[in-house]
């Protein structure tokens, strides 16, 4: 609403009868009759800001016209014809214009809702009134209750009822309270009998349902409707929610991972809402740092749900109405038991009042409040989570900038909002299912550039699920972008997938500790979970091998690939999960023959950790019992031993070109090395040659030429100590754990038989 409404009564008293006079005459008459405290400011406006005065006059005229229109509808003729009554059409257009431009106050919505549902006017008029019910701020719960009471009278048509339910679902988050509406749950449920109303009533019930609303007779009714109408998505949604609260009452199988149950009810009002947001758009706020404590977010000028501005935190019952004399005793008693969110300032305060907190009507406001994030994470109230996920899904879809071309100018606001979501997910150490659904829907449309950092961070927080289900929805599309993008994008994707693997492993490691492994149902579940993790690792291995070919064995890319396998090699020991997956040959041999010392050092460390994990797995009796379940076969040990033999041959025994490594003999002959088959070791390896030269120059600084082949015997041991002193800890761990120091050097492999 425009701010001029607050002085409406004063201006009405000062309005003169000189309607045909000029604006200056009217302003003079109004200026003389103002209070002395206000006259100075008003006079200043009149002298220095004539444009503002004209705008003020236009807004006041618009406000007056709206009041006249509302008064006309409130006292208007019964069953007036729209086509014949020009006055009616004039007032309808006035209401529509103001609603689309500024939104309507809660008092005006209260009056117009009663008019639309009371049947005073024709069906066409009622439809137009309902379509322009756009709130400026909030909608009063009492207005909704009175509107629902008109449905019992039966004076409005079926199409009007459908439109009202669609409006109620679309505006659900902007109703100031829900207690009285929830008491009408039985009435709404009875409306499921109407086939036209059923989808929208199901959606409303889905938003309202609490555990106490789930009754056996309602379950039977829903099952009867499903048998009559078939597997309708809206019925499945309500049944799924009922099954969550009372699994014993519902034995039928329901889809587990269905993403979309309801059609978007906001489509009718989308244009008007966008107009309100455009008019009231304020400057983009800076991203907020999520800290433990209340968030002091300054309210902005926006009057509608917008992703670029998180809703301001307001308790549904902490309003100015608490001081009104006409408030009922029951309302006072109900409100006295709840703790206002505005007064929540510290974590101890949260613990003391956790039993009497009342969450806000706009659930999106919890994103900026770490205390409320703690609350919804600990309490796990399903209706609360459903409300939050519904809000998040709708707003992500509304504001995603690559869905709509005209939204690119708001890219910074959308980016800031995604940053807020990511901070909340990091704070909770858990991903939101609404973001997962958003990724599945938007990835095919994503160009790989817009909001890249935020998008890939959302990928890393996808909740754990079956890889086979996620792959066609996400990873297949991601692979197409991966192969056709720059090396920097490839590295970003690998980093994101490493974080995704870490989050999945943390979730599974916590889950396995909360439940006994000896329970047979869990064994099956854990085996399936390990299979999903294994498929994710193999998927990254496939991406990495192909990327190395595309990027000509780029060292920068190889660093990110080995970072991923540093996480993979320690799954068994660090996360206590029965899984060991080796890297593919294309990655192993690329790293082994790399010219970069840090790459080879990193490979040595990974091989050392693989050895530790496989040795621990071999000794563990639990793994022996569940060997077939978790695929700890001799093939894994044989593959590791083969890698180990190749590494020792390249770094220690000077026998590199055995099984697994092939280089064209013509290329080897061009190197000019006489006995190339016996020349590659820790001294002659291309990545260590500079170290060998530096070592020899330290011993004999006066020498003009050096012979690296002279490093043998005692010099060999001194040279190793020199390498270890240069920070090559991976090489040090590998040689000390995997090389047998004797007169005949050989690799210390792992016995792949059942007996260790």
From Swiss-Prot:
Polar residues bias (residue ranges): 10-28, 35-50
Region (Disordered) location: 1-60
Organism domain of life: Eukaryota
Compartments in which it is found: Nucleus; Chromosome, Centromere
InterPro entries associated with the record: CENP-I
Pfam families for the chain: CENP-I (PF07778)
Entry PTM: Sumoylated. Sumoylated form can be polyubiquitinated by RNF4, leading to its degradation. Desumoylation by SENP6 prevents its degradation.
Induction: By follicle-stimulating hormone (FSH).
GO CC field: cytosol; inner kinetochore; kinetochore; nuclear body; nucleoplasm; nucleus
UniProtKB keywords: Centromere, Chromosome, Nucleus, Ubl conjugation
A Gene Ontology BP annotation from the UniProt entry: mitotic sister chromatid segregation
Record family assignment: Belongs to the CENP-I/CTF3 family.
Protein function: Component of the CENPA-CAD (nucleosome distal) complex, a complex recruited to centromeres which is involved in assembly of kinetochore proteins, mitotic progression and chromosome segregation. May be involved in incorporation of newly synthesized CENPA into centromeres via its interaction with the CENPA-NAC complex. Required for the localization of CENPF, MAD1L1 and MAD2 (MAD2L1 or MAD2L2) to kinetochores. Involved in the response of gonadal tissues to follicle-stimulating hormone.
Quaternary structure and partners: Component of the CENPA-CAD complex, composed of CENPI, CENPK, CENPL, CENPO, CENPP, CENPQ, CENPR and CENPS. The CENPA-CAD complex interacts with the CENPA-NAC complex, at least composed of CENPA, CENPC, CENPH, CENPM, CENPN, CENPT and CENPU. Interacts with SENP6.
PANTHER family listed in its UniProt record: CENTROMERE PROTEIN I
Name of the featured protein: Centromere protein I
């Amino acid at each position: 609403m425009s701010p001029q409404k607050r002085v409406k009564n004063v201006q009405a008293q000062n309005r003169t009868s000189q309607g045909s006079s000029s604006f200056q005459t009217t302003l003079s008459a109004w200026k003389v009759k103002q209070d002395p405290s206000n006259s100075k400011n008003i006079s200043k406006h009149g002298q220095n800001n004539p444009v503002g005065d004209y705008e003020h006059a236009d807004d006041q005229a618009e406000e007056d016209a709206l009041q006249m229109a509302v008064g006309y509808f409130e006292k208007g003729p019964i069953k007036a014809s729209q086509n014949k009554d020009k006055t009616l059409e004039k007032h309808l257009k006035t209401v529509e214009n103001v609603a689309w431009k500024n939104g309507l106050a809660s008092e005006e919505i209260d009056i117009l809702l009663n008019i639309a549902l009371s049947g005073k006017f024709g069906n066409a008029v009622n439809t137009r009134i309902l379509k322009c019910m756009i709130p400026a701020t909030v909608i009063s719960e009492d207005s909704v209750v009175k509107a629902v009471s008109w449905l019992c009278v039966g004076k409005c048509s079926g199409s009007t009822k459908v439109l009202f339910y669609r409006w109620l679902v679309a505006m659900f988050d902007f109703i100031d309270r829900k207690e009285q509406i929830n008491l009408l749950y039985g009435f709404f449920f009875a409306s499921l009998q109407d086939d036209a109303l059923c989808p929208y009533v199901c959606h409303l019930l889905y938003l309202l349902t609490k555990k106490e609303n789930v009754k056996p007779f309602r379950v039977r009714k829903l099952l009867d409707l499903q048998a009559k109408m078939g597997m309708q998505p809206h019925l499945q949604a309500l049944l799924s929610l009922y099954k969550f609260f009372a699994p014993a009452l519902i034995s039928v199988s329901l889809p587990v991972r269905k993403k979309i149950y309801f059609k978007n009810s906001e489509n009718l009002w989308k244009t008007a809402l966008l107009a309100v947001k455009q008019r009231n758009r304020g400057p983009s706020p800076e991203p907020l740092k999520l800290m433990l404590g209340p968030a002091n977010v300054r309210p902005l000028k926006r009057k509608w749900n917008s992703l670029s501005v998180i809703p301001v935190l307001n308790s549904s019952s902490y309003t100015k109405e608490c001081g009104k004399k006409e408030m009922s005793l029951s309302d006072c008693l109900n409100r006295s038991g709840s703790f206002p969110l505005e007064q929540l300032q510290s974590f101890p305060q949260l613990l003391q009042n956790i039993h009497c907190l009342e969450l806000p009507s706009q659930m999106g406001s919890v994103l900026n409040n770490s205390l409320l994030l703690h609350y919804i994470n600990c309490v796990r109230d399903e209706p609360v989570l459903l409300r939050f996920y519904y809000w998040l899904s709708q707003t992500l879809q509304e504001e995603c900038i690559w869905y709509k071309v005209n939204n690119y100018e708001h890219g910074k606001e959308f980016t800031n909002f995604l940053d807020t979501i990511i901070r909340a997910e990091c704070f909770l150490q858990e991903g939101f299912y609404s973001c997962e659904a958003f990724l599945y829907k938007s990835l095919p449309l994503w160009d790989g550039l817009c909001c890249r950092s935020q998008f890939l961070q959302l990928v890393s927080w996808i909740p754990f699920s079956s890889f086979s289900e996620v792959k066609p929805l996400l990873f297949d599309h991601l692979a197409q972008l991966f192969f056709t993008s720059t090396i920097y994008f490839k590295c970003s994707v690998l980093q994101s997938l490493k974080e995704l693997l870490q989050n999945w492993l943390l979730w599974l490691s916590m889950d396995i500790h909360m439940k006994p492994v000896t329970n047979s149902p869990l064994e099956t579940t854990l085996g399936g979970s390990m299979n999903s993790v294994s498929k994710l690792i193999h998927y990254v291995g496939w991406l990495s091998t192909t990327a190395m070919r595309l990027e000509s064995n780029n060292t920068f890319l190889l660093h990110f690939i080995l970072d991923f396998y540093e996480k993979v090699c320690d799954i068994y020991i660090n996360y206590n999960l029965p899984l060991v997956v080796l890297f593919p040959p294309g990655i192993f041999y690329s790293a082994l023959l790399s010219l970069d010392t840090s790459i080879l050092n990193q490979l040595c460390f990974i091989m050392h950790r693989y050895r530790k994990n496989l040795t621990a797995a071999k000794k563990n009796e639990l793994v022996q019992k569940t060997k077939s379940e978790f695929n700890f076969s001799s093939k894994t040990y044989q593959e590791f031993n083969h890698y180990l033999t190749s590494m020792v041959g390249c770094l220690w025994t000077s026998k590199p070109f055995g099984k697994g490594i092939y280089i064209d003999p013509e290329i080897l002959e061009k190197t000019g090395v006489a006995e190339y088959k016996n020349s590659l070791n820790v001294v002659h390896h291309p990545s260590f040659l500079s170290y060998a030269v530096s070592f020899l120059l330290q011993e004999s600084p006066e020498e003009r030429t050096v012979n690296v082949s002279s490093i043998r015997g005692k010099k060999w041991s001194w040279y190793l100590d020199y390498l270890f002193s240069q920070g090559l800890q991976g090489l040090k761990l590998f040689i000390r754990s995997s090389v047998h120091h004797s007169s005949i050097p050989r690799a210390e492999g792992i016995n792949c038989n059942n007996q260790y």
